From Swiss-Prot:
Pfam family, one: Ribosomal_S17
Subunit structure: Part of the 30S ribosomal subunit.
Keyword Ribosomal protein attributed: yes
Name of the protein in question: Small ribosomal subunit protein uS17
Domain of life: Bacteria
MF (Gene Ontology): rRNA binding; structural constituent of ribosome
Keyword vocabulary terms for this entry: Ribonucleoprotein, Ribosomal protein, RNA-binding, rRNA-binding
Gene Ontology cellular component annotations, sorted alphabetically: cytosolic small ribosomal subunit
Length: 89
């Protein structure tokens, strides 16, 4: 029997914290339009995502996917690192 995984939500965001073990905090920005005044508003939401190998670092742009509950706050997991953060050396 094959599982249908096509309906899982995927988000792209920036890693804002990697200080926890196997967990990253990803900030996802969305642009919405106010229903009455039609002004575009930028909103952001933070998700805690599972990072099994501690690959992602602060500032990286990552893709996360919805998954089963892994802890009290974690319902997302890291799929891939889209772009590494630029470091000054």
């Amino acid at each position: 029997m094959t599982e249908n995984r096509a309906n899982r939500k995927i988000r792209i965001g920036t890693v804002s914290s990697d200080k926890m073990d196997k967990t990253i905090t990803v900030s996802v920005e969305t642009v919405k339009q106010h229903p009455l005044y039609k002004k575009t508003i930028k909103t952001s939401k933070k998700y805690k995502a599972h990072d099994e190998n501690n690959e992602a670092k602060t500032g990286d742009i990552v893709k996360i996917m919805e998954t089963r509950p892994l802890s009290k706050d974690k319902r997302w997991r890291l799929v891939e690192i889209v772009q590494k953060a630029k470091t000054l050396q």
